[in-house]
Amino acid sequence: MNLLTVSTDLISIFLFTTLFLFFARKVAKKVGLVDKPNFRKRHQGLIPLVGGISVYAGICFTFGIVDYYIPHASLYLACAGVLVFIGALDDRFDISVKIRATIQAAVGIVMMVFGNLYLSSLGYIFGSWEMVLGPFGYFLTLFAVWAAINAFNMVDGIDGLLGGLSCVSFAAIGMILWFDGQTSLAIWCFAMIAAILPYIMLNLGILGRRYKVFMGDAGSTLIGFTVIWILLETTQGKTHPISPVTALWIIAIPLMDMVAIMYRRLRKGMSPFSPDRQHIHHLIMRAGFTSRQAFVLITLAAALLASIGVLAEYSHFVPEWVMLVLFLLAFLLYGYCIKRAWKVARFIKRVKRRLRRNRGGSPNLTK
């Protein structure tokens, strides 16, 4: 396998997914698989919810054209296919949370039983001894599957954000695996990025606002499930290339946002799944940034946190328990900002006004 072959495959995946996306959006409008504007959604017109379906089609295409071994490929496609199908039904008919959670749990059980993919160890996060989970690992795995799916679902609030954050996660995992010699899994991660990029282009309106699409619950479910699947493949076992604590850094922003928001809702006596406008992108936009600027800032923050995890993985001199402590400190800082969102927004607005005044007051230099 050489870089030319890999590049050709990735370009083929990108082109296939792009063509499929244009086809799928036409079908979606005919069958009513569209997002309608309401008091919480500010877009105009009916937007096809086909981003996730196109990404899944791109991965099916990937597994069909590549000639290298991807572990549990058929099992993954079957499990992911069920989740995408249920997600599409939810996008169309609004299925209850209990039904979706039950199906996600069932898929998680199939993954553990037939793929032997489960959390058996959390690594050395408490010092010099390994935290082996035993039978409790099966229950924690189900929670991890649910958490990953919901974490990526909850960040899908502004254009481009879900795509950007998922690309950061897959890029971080792919880089670690590539340099560790786990080529097939690395290519899978890069193929996910190639399949997501066409969605980002249409979602951001780069090819024109008339072609806009949304990811839908089918897409966020697929992305979250794929992330946790690959992490289980790579963080468990005797010769795992990624430490379990590194996984926290790789999905830091979606994970922090989900935990902070759910905690805030529960404290208010609300359902953890009830919608509100307290997510990180809402905070940044209240500070005066546009939706596009918020997307860029959050994606860069996610890339920074993921880079910390990747560098620590390669350095080998930072203990896993130290990385856990640092992650918890980062999470506490995030929670502080969310809890005092109005203060943070006011501070950012004040800084922006000062910067504008400084730019406006600087003398013009002429030759």
From Swiss-Prot:
The chain crosses the membrane at residues 3-23, 46-66, 69-89, 132-152, 158-178, 187-207, 213-233, 242-262, 294-314, 318-338. Keywords: Cell inner membrane, Cell membrane, Glycosyltransferase, Lipopolysaccharide biosynthesis, Magnesium, Manganese, Membrane, Transferase, Transmembrane, Transmembrane helix. It catalyses: di-trans,octa-cis-undecaprenyl phosphate + UDP-N-acetyl-alpha-D-glucosamine = N-acetyl-alpha-D-glucosaminyl-di-trans,octa-cis-undecaprenyl diphosphate + UMP. InterPro entries: ECA_WecA-rel, Glycosyl_transferase_4. One of its GO terms (biological process) is cell wall macromolecule biosynthetic process. Pathway: Bacterial outer membrane biogenesis; LPS O-antigen biosynthesis; Bacterial outer membrane biogenesis; enterobacterial common antigen biosynthesis. Its cofactor is Mg(2+); Mn(2+). It is an enzyme of class 2 (transferase). The keyword Ribonucleoprotein does not apply. Belongs to the glycosyltransferase 4 family. WecA subfamily. Catalyzes the transfer of the GlcNAc-1-phosphate moiety from UDP-GlcNAc onto the carrier lipid undecaprenyl phosphate (C55-P), yielding GlcNAc-pyrophosphoryl-undecaprenyl (GlcNAc-PP-C55). This is Undecaprenyl-phosphate alpha-N-acetylglucosaminyl 1-phosphate transferase. It comes from Escherichia coli O157:H7. The gene is wecA.
